[in-house]
Structures are given as C-alpha cells and as structure tokens.
C-alpha cells in the first residue's frame, strides 16, 4: 500500500516529479501575507512547545494570536473555547486539536499539518488522539534544543526571501526598523497595510480607534 505521504506527495507523474525536484523545490519563497510577529522575528523567539506554534492563544497584552484555521477545526468539532483561545494547559489544548484533526481529512489543514510534521520534525506517522503524546514529545524536544527551530531558524529552513507582515495603519513599525538595522537577518521583512479596525464599524472601540488614526 502506498504511504499516506512521501516525497512524491501530490506529484502524480514523472514529469511533475522532475519539474518539482529539479526546479521548484529550492526556489526562494516570497510570502506576501503572513501573521508572523515582527517582534518575534527580531527577538528570534524560541517556542516552548508545539501548541504555542500551532494554536497560539491569549497574549500577555490580552490580544489573541494563533492559527485561526486550526481554531476553526476545533470549533467545528465541538471543542470548548477554553481549549482554543482559553487558559487550558497547552498539552490539553494540543490533545483536543489532535483528536479533531482526523475529522478534516480532505481539508487542506490535514495535509498542511502532516507536511509540517515531516519537514520540520521528521515525523512520518499520522497525528490523532492516540499519537498526540509521541508527537508532543518529539516536537517539543526539537523546539527546545535545536537551534534551527527558532522563529528565524524556521524561516531560513523554508528558504523564505521575503515576508510581508500584516500591520495596522497606526502601528509604529518599531520592530520592522530594528529588523532592517540587524545585519544578521538575511531575509527581507516589510509591513503591509491591513486596516481591519478602520472598517469594522460595528465592533466596540471603533470610535476610539478612529481617534488614534
């Protein structure tokens, strides 16, 4: 039986395999829309565990950060919000996500997660509720001890040449300035205009925000 995912994943002909491995695989990536924090890029954050990478959560300033596509998977499967953006322990939050993931076979999220596990962590299995513990331990060991698994390290491993962060019009771009002045950062990081707060007139705080703008 063919493996669920191997190096020829989605490459269904010899021509596709040749074109990808010979030309496309090593091409630099220009990511014009991402949610990586410029502060975390500059400070080269090291994540403590895979839940922090994948699920994010409530930040010290009260804001939320994380992959809302993964949150949607959990919500669609009836996971209580306290495990998604709440204060439950990261291990429990990851368990809930792992249990929900098999329910979205056919959704790109299922493939994205397994591609990431293979590329960055060398995990060849399938993530579900039963394998969550071994995946948790494997990923956390690499995140905590491998110097290539910091924010900058992951970007460099992915051969990213350009990152466009999503920024509010009133951001002072202080972290972008620091990044530009740091010669150790070899890839380009630039802000992009995302005025969500200026058009969400129905949300609390709109008037105060417009005053700042």
Language-model segments: which ranges?
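Metal-cofactor-binding active-site regions of metalloenzymes
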Residues: 1-213
């Amino acid at each position: 039986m063919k493996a669920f995912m191997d190096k020829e994943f989605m490459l269904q002909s010899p021509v596709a395999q040749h074109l990808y491995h010979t030309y496309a695989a090593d091409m630099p990536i220009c990511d014009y829309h991402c949610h990586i924090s410029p502060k975390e890029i500059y400070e080269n954050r090291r994540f403590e565990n895979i839940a922090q990478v994948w699920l994010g959560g409530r930040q010290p300033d009260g804001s939320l950060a994380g992959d809302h596509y993964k949150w949607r998977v959990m919500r669609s499967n009836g996971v209580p919000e306290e495990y998604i953006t709440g204060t439950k322990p990261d291990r429990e939050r990851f368990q809930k996500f792992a249990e929900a993931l098999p329910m979205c076979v056919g959704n790109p999220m299922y493939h994205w997660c397994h591609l990431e596990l293979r590329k960055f962590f060398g995990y060849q299995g399938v993530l579900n509720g039963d394998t969550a513990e071994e995946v948790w331990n494997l990923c956390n060991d690499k995140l905590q001890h491998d110097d290539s698994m910091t924010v900058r390290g992951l970007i460099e491993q992915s051969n990213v040449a350009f990152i466009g962060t999503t920024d509010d019009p009133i951001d002072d771009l202080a972290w972008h300035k620091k990044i530009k002045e740091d010669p150790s950062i070899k890839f380009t990081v630039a802000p992009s205009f995302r005025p969500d707060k200026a058009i969400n007139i129905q949300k609390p705080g709109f008037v105060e925000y417009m005053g700042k703008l």
